[in-house]
Amino acid sequence: MVSIRLPDGSVRQYEHPVTVAEVAASIGPGLAKAALGGKIDGELVDTSALIDHDVALAIVTEKDADGLDIIRHSTAHLLAYAVKDLYPEAQVTIGPVIDNGFYYDFAYNRPFTPEDLEKIEKRMQELAKKDEPVSRRVVSRDEAVDYFKSIGEKYKAEIIESIPATDEIKLYSHGGFTDLCRGPHVPSTGKLKVFKLMKVAGAYWRGDSKNEQLQRIYGTAWTKKEDQEAYLHMLEEAEKRDHRKLGKQLDLFHMQDESPGMVFWHPRGWTLWQQVEQYMRRRVNDAGYLEIKTPMIMDRSLWEASGHWQNYRENMFTTESEKRDYAIKPMNCPGHVQVFNHGLRSYRDLPLRYAEFGSCHRNESSGALHGLMRVRGFVQDDAHIFCTEDQFISESIAFNTLAMSVYKDFGFDHVEIKLSLRPDARAGTDETWDRAEQGLREALTACGVTWEELPGEGAFYGPKVEYHIKDALGRSWQCGTLQLDMVLPERLGAEYVAEDNSRRRPIMLHRAIVGSMERFLGILIEHHAGAMPAWLAPMQVVVMNIAESQTEYAQSLAQSLQKQGVRVAADLRNEKISYKIREHTLEKVPYLLVVGDKEREAQTVAVRARGGVDLGVMPLDTFIERLRQDVQSFN
């Protein structure tokens, strides 16, 4: 007798072992038709999985997130099937699920063209309509190697040869195609109805630039056509908002080959940067942080003591001078510990909060670089809090409150919080980890926020809270972190004198709110589509004259605004006013002031707000008050 507990708490009993598909059929024909897989005691399996002992079972359908992952994984295999069918000489490699879709890497003797993608997608649709059953078989490693070698698939054979000889290998087949995979997969190809191939890109075998270059075909797959259409519309909107395009259009920054992964900030872009940095500086100063500055280049010995040289060396830029090895800092924490160590600290000094807009450099691979989002040189709004064990909960509460307030000011109202818990390989005792994890839970509870827990995702030296902001397109970006560190203070000899005169290690909290300033500015630009709120806009107002007779008046207006701290420019060119308005509208300036003879004589201005909104004619003082209220509403 096999007892199966369902999600609603009910229990079904079966005389003999049953498959997930048979359980679904016993519940009802609708569920049997909808079943894509199952979860046996939390493990995702195929509908063909046999149940021969008492378990908890959930039937997975397209309504579940796991169901969508199964569909996308199976669609990746369908893509490989279609490519092999159309181009038999192509070799398959790997094809995982990624956010919003999947990809598959191929080795082929010529580049795939857009016309090829159309042809492949059409063939995928034809194969899906055949509704071929998907079968799974388990073989030994050596059997799998021999099979893929026999059909000329050297990449698959190489993958399997790297697997321990004692491991069993799962092979999935549909029609004339067989692939290596952990699974699970849909029961038949007819379940794959909504998909689209997106693009082709280059990739290296096993991600190593020393290996052969492959072709990566990206695709997306969904359970409903309307979901796919919404996603494709989002991509179109994202293309319009691309910070690289807007950076050029708005004259904010540029990048060039002579300095890969580094940013050339133009005047307006640097003005935007300064608004963000000065805002952050005010907020951390108000929160009791002490701003410091640490060297960009430090001796190898310090990086060895911190552990970075051993564990992060390949991502560090290094140099040599006078027979000494140095590294350009990839992060600020070792330098902050040096400031803490400079002098004897007492428990009365704690908590000590050190903040730095620290310039860091990391040797990211050239293929990973992406505009402002992934750079080699960046500035972090970094800070480290040195505190006692009794203080770290209150410090965590204060940080969470500050971070959530900052995100709201920048226009991010939806923030997801994740708590990464202890990994298998870790420093410290279970008791220490228990206190650390529970302390962070207590802090988040006190803040009234909800969070998702990620078992095993913490760093080896402590648990971490992550802050993921959602932008206007619903995309999630991890920005803030609060990382508890139980290792670095010991490695670098940080200590304080406790109340009983003993020497103790401080708790160290690494924290950032926006993270990389470059990346955050890229997110901001895309979130606001370049139309920054008035308090952030690099140019808040442009004053324009209609004719030369108003030049002096327009200049005086601009000067008056500038004295009030407004970021303003005067456009006095001998151009049609419609041309000027259009040009500055494309620059996404929040307010345009137009002056003609009537406005000059009445000492007023005609005001146009961004979006072409005519606010009418008003005295300059009235406009300044309106602008002030606009700025204060955001900040």
From Swiss-Prot:
UniProt keywords, alphabetically: Aminoacyl-tRNA synthetase, ATP-binding, Cytoplasm, Ligase, Metal-binding, Nucleotide-binding, Protein biosynthesis, RNA-binding, tRNA-binding, Zinc
Purpose of the protein: Catalyzes the attachment of threonine to tRNA(Thr) in a two-step reaction: L-threonine is first activated by ATP to form Thr-AMP and then transferred to the acceptor end of tRNA(Thr). Also edits incorrectly charged L-seryl-tRNA(Thr).
Cofactor comment text: Binds 1 zinc ion per subunit.
Cofactor: Zn(2+)
Pfam families to which the protein is assigned, alphabetical: HGTP_anticodon, TGS, tRNA-synt_2b, tRNA_SAD
Family: Belongs to the class-II aminoacyl-tRNA synthetase family.
Entry EC no(s): 6.1.1.3
GO BP terms, alphabetized: threonyl-tRNA aminoacylation
Subcellular location: Cytoplasm
Domain TGS residues, every copy: 1-61
Chain residues that bind Zn(2+): 333, 384, 510
Catalyzed reactions per annotation: tRNA(Thr) + L-threonine + ATP = L-threonyl-tRNA(Thr) + AMP + diphosphate + H(+)
Matching Gene3D superfamilies: 3.10.20.30, 3.30.54.20, Anticodon-binding domain (3.40.50.800), Bira Bifunctional Protein, Domain 2 (3.30.930.10), Threonyl-trna Synthetase, Chain A, domain 2 (3.30.980.10)
InterPro entries listed in its UniProt record: aa-tRNA-synt_IIb, aa-tRNA-synth_II, aa-tRNA-synth_II/BPL/LPL, Anticodon-bd, Anticodon-bd_dom_sf, Beta-grasp_dom_sf, TGS, TGS-like
Protein name as catalogued: Threonine--tRNA ligase
Chief location: cytoplasm
Record's keyword annotation contains GTP-binding: no
PROSITE patterns: AA_TRNA_LIGASE_II (PS50862), TGS (PS51880)
Subunit structure, interactors included: Homodimer.
One term under GO cellular component: cytosol
Molecular function GO terms recorded: ATP binding; metal ion binding; threonine-tRNA ligase activity; tRNA binding
